[in-house]
Amino acid sequence: MITVALAKGALLNDSVARFQSAGLDFSAVLDPGNRQLMVPSHCGRARALLVRNGDVPVYVAYGQAQLGVVGYDVLREHQMPVAQLVDLGFGGCRMAVAVKASSGYQHAADLPPHCRVASKFTHCAREFFDALDLPVELVHLTGSVELGPLTGIAEAIVDLVATGRTLRDNGLVAIEELFQSSARLIGHPLALRLDRGDLQLIVEAMRIQESLPKNPA
C-alpha cells in the first residue's frame, strides 16, 4: 500500500486535489467531521497520514510514507534526506528578513553585528547570515515572530511572507529575500528505487499536470 504524508493546514486542499488528479482520492480528509489521522483512499490502494507541516519530511525520510507534500521552506530548514520530485506550484511565499519600517535599514547587511534576529527558521537564518559574514544572535520563536522587533527582543526577523499584509499591519517591512518557497512533492529515495511502477505513475502524473499551461485567473 502506498502511504502519503499530507500536511494539515494551508497546503491540504491543493495537495488533495493534486493526488486526486493523479488517481488517488483522499478527499475524505477534508470532511469537517473527520477525526482520523490515517485515512484510506477511495480505491483502497493508498492511505494518507495527516501530520504537522514540519513532520512531513520526517515520515518520508524514515520510510513510513513513500510520498509527501511539504513547503520548500520546511525542506530547507530541516534538511532531511528525501528526494524532491516535483514543484507543485501552490503555496507560494518567500523567506525574507524584515525589520521595523521606521528602522532605516535597507538591506540585511545594514544590521549591526551581534544584533538579535528572531525566527522559526533558525537554520535558514543561520545559513543566510553566515553567507553575509554577519554575526547575529538567533532567537528561536514558534509563533508571531512579528512581535520580535515590536517588543525589542530582536532587531529583525526571518520569516515567511506571502502578501506582506501581516508585516504592514505590524509596522514591519521586508528588506531582503532569502529564497522563494512553494509546495513540493517529495519521496523516500529507497522506496523510489525499489518501486515497481506504482509510485512513478503518480509522480509522472503530477509532473505532467504541472507542465500543462495554467488557465489565467
UniProtKB/Swiss-Prot annotation:
EC number(s) per entry: 2.4.2.17
NCBIfam families to which the protein is assigned, alphabetical: hisG
Function: Catalyzes the condensation of ATP and 5-phosphoribose 1-diphosphate to form N'-(5'-phosphoribosyl)-ATP (PR-ATP). Has a crucial role in the pathway because the rate of histidine biosynthesis seems to be controlled primarily by regulation of HisG enzymatic activity.
Compartments, as annotated in UniProt: Cytoplasm
Notes on the domains: Lacks the C-terminal regulatory region which is replaced by HisZ.
Signal peptide stretch: none
Pathway in which the depicted protein is active: Amino-acid biosynthesis; L-histidine biosynthesis; L-histidine from 5-phospho-alpha-D-ribose 1-diphosphate: step 1/9
Lineage: Bacteria, Bacillati, Cyanobacteriota, Cyanophyceae, Synechococcales
One Pfam family named in its UniProt record: HisG
Keyword set includes Zinc: no
Protein name: ATP phosphoribosyltransferase
PANTHER family assigned: ATP PHOSPHORIBOSYLTRANSFERASE, ATP PHOSPHORIBOSYLTRANSFERASE ATP-PRTASE
Record keywords: Amino-acid biosynthesis, ATP-binding, Cytoplasm, Glycosyltransferase, Histidine biosynthesis, Nucleotide-binding, Transferase
One Gene Ontology CC term in the entry: cytoplasm
Organism annotation: Prochlorococcus marinus (strain MIT 9313)
Source organism superkingdom: Bacteria
The protein's assembly and partners: Heteromultimer composed of HisG and HisZ subunits.
GO biological-process terms attached to the record: L-histidine biosynthetic process
GO molecular function: ATP binding; ATP phosphoribosyltransferase activity
